[in-house]
Swiss-Prot record:
Belongs to the PsaL family. It comes from Picosynechococcus sp. (strain ATCC 27264 / PCC 7002 / PR-6) (Agmenellum quadruplicatum). This is Photosystem I reaction center subunit XI. Pfam families: PsaL. The chain crosses the membrane at residues 71-91, 124-144. Keywords: Membrane, Photosynthesis, Photosystem I, Thylakoid, Transmembrane, Transmembrane helix. The keyword Nucleotide-binding does not apply. It is found in: Cellular thylakoid membrane. Its main location: membrane. It is a multi-pass membrane protein. GO terms for cellular component: photosystem I reaction center; plasma membrane-derived thylakoid membrane.
Length: 152
C-alpha cells in the first residue's frame, strides 16, 4: 500500500500526498480568489487586496512605534497604505518582466489564464491597490467606530 504517489509526472516533483490530494484541500485552494474560476484579474486583485489591507492595519496601528500616541490609528492607516503601495509596485514589476502562462498542478488543475499576460497582471495590481487601501480604510473605520458603539 503506497500512500504517496507522484502527481502525474514523477519528474516534476509534485507528490500526491493525503493532504494535498484530498478533496477538501483541492476545494479550499480552488475557492481562493487567485484560483476561482470566472473572476477577472481586477476582481482577483480587489479581493486579495481587501484581505491584505484589512489584516495589515492591525499590526501597524497596535504594534507600531506610534502605538501609544493619540493618532496611532491614522499612523497605522498611513503605514498600511504605504506598504500596500510598495506591494503594488512589486506586483507591477513582476508583471512587466514577461510572465509565462500558469502551469497546471495537482491542486490547481485549471489555473486562471488571465494571470499569464502583462495586461492581466496590470489589472491585478490595480485591483490590489484599490482593494488594499479600501481594506485598510474599513479596518480603520471599525477601530474608530467600535469604541463609540460601546458607549451606547
Amino acid at each position: 500500500m503506497d500512500i504517496i504517489q507522484h502527481g502525474g509526472d514523477p519528474q516534476v516533483g509534485n507528490l500526491a500526498t493525503p493532504i494535498n490530494a484530498s478533496a477538501f484541500s483541492k476545494a479550499f485552494i480552488n475557492n481562493l480568489p487567485g484560483y476561482r474560476q470566472g473572476l477577472s484579474a481586477q476582481r482577483r486583485g480587489l479581493e486579495v487586496g481587501m484581505a491584505h489591507g484589512y489584516f495589515l492595519y492591525g499590526p501597524f496601528a497596535l504594534l507600531g512605534p506610534l502605538r501609544n500616541a493619540d493618532f496611532a490609528g491614522v499612523a497605522g492607516l498611513l503605514g498600511t497604505v504605504g506598504l500596500i503601495s510598495l506591494l503594488t509596485l512589486a506586483l507591477s514589476l513582476y508583471g512587466s518582466v514577461g510572465v509565462s502562462t500558469p502551469t497546471a498542478t495537482l491542486t490547481t488543475p485549471n489555473p486562471p489564464e488571465n494571470l499569464g499576460t502583462k495586461e492581466g497582471w496590470s489589472e491585478f495590481a490595480a485591483g490590489f491597490l484599490i482593494g488594499g487601501c479600501g481594506g485598510a480604510l474599513v479596518a480603520y473605520g471599525l477601530c474608530i467606530a467600535l469604541p463609540m458603539m460601546y458607549t451606547i
